């Protein structure tokens, strides 16, 4: 099998990734301009990205009595200061606006007898959100002058003189190679799962917290193109219901369940209640022989059983099915919890592209929004929507103010070269290893030497140096891999993306000489927190090597612009 068909497309805006941020950016651009848009989506926008299975709450909302600065303060505290104040504030100021827009599109938001949204805690509101992604996708599909290309896997940016010109990719169903030339490009490809050995093995390995098909393509393409990245060392580890990997917040906030150990002792007060502290506390209780750990649901009111079962049907039905299979309701037994493997995801932590206040990266004309954008943790759904909107608004303004020539007399030659690269991988050459075996080897290395589950999320510099050496060996070996069809070709590039991210992640973990976030970055060589490290750890690939850049913190009242 080989790629024989080619297509060159010219457009005003290319959106890579038709998930939460990408779809909302398209809606905003078309509302504010007549720009032509191409959305390149690896799956199908109807059920792709983090919203594919739905959600049961809007976790970032300014409820009555609160203001945007309150949300900024919450996110800053959770990340222990390492956030971009400008990004958090501009996001927080628009959370309610995008929520209202989603309701207008058809999202069901629960209301009380007074017609007010039903709050869940200080920042959340309840929704019936199983169909939230189809709602968003349907709105995009109705837009004029928007070409959605599903099953198109983008593999490389086209960058000249640090300016984005477009991207290359291939279609996984018909094998067409694409070169898409654009005046502006928005990367909205999500975060990176599958770097570490997961909770569940074998056939169930994709039973994980984050979409297993979000493999960090946007990060990897940016790294290889010389974009500056930030705070990869702030990994995200989710505290989840054991085995089902269902959310714990639904129980903790829905019925006020506390974290308890096997002795019934509440331990969350001992370690703290930030996201990383909740994971760390659970890990420590298990290490010190007081596990397993649970959310204490035993004894809750019987009517809460039904509420919890219904809530999980909107996003994690396996948890409801587990209760039914066991023949015991939540009120009759506590829910066991565990930490997941680490992920790189800018929607929960501050890891991702280093962007200016308008979400433009250090590559001119390339924007990042949602999980792929760094500096702005605790985005959740609405934050990703806002970042898509903010990037879109700046794109519209720049398209008005600037003139562009996106044609290139080498277009056909460049696409021919990319097709040769694809077909070289699609060749019939014998390979000692399969792509899946190589992926498992990568995950084992990261798990053992870069702070995975088996090492209780801990690492030291010697281990990280070994991880770097072994990942580089795997990169060399991956050059011998081959793919039998277009689907396997996608797997090849997903592996390539993950290996690229692993190297950058390792450099970030080495660079921060402190432990600011337990479990997220548990550095045994530097177990204490230090004020000397109240700064961003950034990286940039220069001449094939990863260069570490330290930057000072940016506050809410600053409008940050790149100096390059």
Model-predicted regions and their roles:
Residues 8-11, 174-184, 362:
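Core beta-strand elements of the Rossmann-like FAD/NAD(P) dinucleotide-binding domain
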Residues 31-53:
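Glycine-rich FAD pyrophosphate-binding loop
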Residues 104-155, 231-380, 385, 448-564:
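Mobile, glycine/GP-rich and aromatic-enriched active-site lid/loop segments adjacent to catalytic centers
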Residues 400-484:
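Long, amphipathic alpha-helical stalk/connector segments used for oligomerization, subunit docking
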Residues 13-39:
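N-terminal Rossmann-like FAD-binding beta1-loop-alpha1 element of flavoenzymes
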Residues 59-91:
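Glycine-rich active-site loop/strand segments that organize a redox cofactor
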Residues 187-246, 381-394:
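Glycine-rich loop(s) and the adjacent beta-strand/alpha-helix scaffold that form part
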Residues 129-156, 160-179, 219, 225:
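Helical element adjacent to the flavin cofactor pocket in flavoenzyme catalytic cores
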């Amino acid at each position: 099998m080989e790629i024989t068909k080619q297509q060159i497309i010219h457009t005003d805006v290319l959106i890579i990734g038709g998930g939460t941020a990408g779809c909302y950016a398209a809606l905003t651009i078309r509302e504010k301009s007549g720009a032509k848009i191409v959305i390149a989506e690896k799956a199908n926008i109807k059920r792709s990205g983090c919203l594919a299975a739905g959600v049961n709450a809007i976790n970032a909302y300014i409820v009555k009595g609160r203001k945007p600065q309150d949300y900024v303060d919450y996110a800053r505290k959770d990340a222990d200061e390492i956030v971009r104040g400008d990004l958090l504030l501009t996001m927080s100021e628009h959370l309610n606006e995008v929520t209202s827009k989603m309701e207008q599109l058809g999202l069901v938001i629960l209301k009380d007898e007074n017609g007010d949204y039903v709050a869940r805690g200080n920042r959340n509101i309840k929704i019936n959100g199983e169909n939230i992604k189809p709602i968003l996708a349907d709105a995009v599909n109705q837009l004029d002058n928007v070409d959605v290309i599903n099953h198109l896997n983008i593999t490389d940016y086209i960058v000249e003189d640090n300016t984005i010109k477009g991207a290359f990719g291939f279609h996984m169903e018909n094998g067409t190679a694409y070169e898409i030339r654009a005046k502006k490009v928005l990367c909205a490809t999500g975060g990176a799962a599958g770097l570490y050995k997961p909770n569940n093995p074998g056939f169930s390995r994709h039973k994980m917290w984050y979409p297993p098909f979000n493999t960090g393509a946007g990060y990897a393409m940016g790294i290889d193109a010389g974009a500056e990245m930030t705070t990869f060392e702030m990994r995200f580890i989710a505290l989840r219901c054991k085995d089902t990997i269902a959310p714990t917040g639904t129980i903790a906030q829905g019925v006020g369940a506390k974290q308890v150990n096997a002795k019934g002792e509440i331990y969350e007060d001992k370690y703290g209640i930030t996201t990383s502290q909740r994971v760390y506390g659970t890990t420590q209780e298990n290490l010190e022989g007081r596990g397993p750990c649970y959310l204490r649901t035993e004894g809750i009111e019987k009517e809460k059983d039904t509420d919890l079962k219904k809530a999980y049907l909107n996003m994690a039905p396996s948890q409801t099915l587990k209760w039914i299979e066991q023949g015991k309701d939540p009120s009759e037994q506590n829910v066991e919890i565990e930490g997941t493997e680490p992920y790189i995801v800018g929607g929960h932590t501050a890891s991702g592209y280093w962007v200016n206040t308008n979400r433009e990266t250090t590559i001119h004309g390339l924007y990042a929004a949602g999980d792929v954008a760094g500096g702005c943790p605790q985005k959740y759904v609405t934050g990703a929507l806002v970042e898509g909107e903010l990037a879109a608004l700046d794109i519209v303004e720049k398209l008005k103010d600037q003139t562009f020539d996106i044609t290139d007399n080498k277009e056909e030659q460049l696409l021919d070269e990319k097709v040769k690269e694809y077909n070289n991988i699609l060749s019939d050459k014998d390979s000692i290893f399969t792509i899946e075996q190589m992926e498992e080897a990568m995950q084992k290395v990261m798990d053992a030497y870069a702070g995975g589950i088996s090492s209780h999320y801990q690492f030291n510099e010697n281990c990280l140096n070994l991880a770097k050496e072994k990942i580089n060996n795997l990169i060399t070996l991956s050059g011998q891999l081959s793919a039998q069809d277009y689907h396997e070709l996608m797997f090849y590039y997903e592996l390539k993306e993950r290996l690229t991210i692993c190297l950058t992640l390792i450099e970030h973990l080495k660079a921060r000489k402190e432990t600011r976030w337990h479990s997220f970055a548990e550095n045994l060589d530097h177990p204490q927190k230090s004020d000397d490290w109240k700064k961003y750890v950034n990286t940039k690939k220069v001449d094939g090597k990863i260069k570490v850049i330290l930057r000072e913190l940016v506050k809410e009242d600053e409008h940050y612009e790149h100096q390059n």
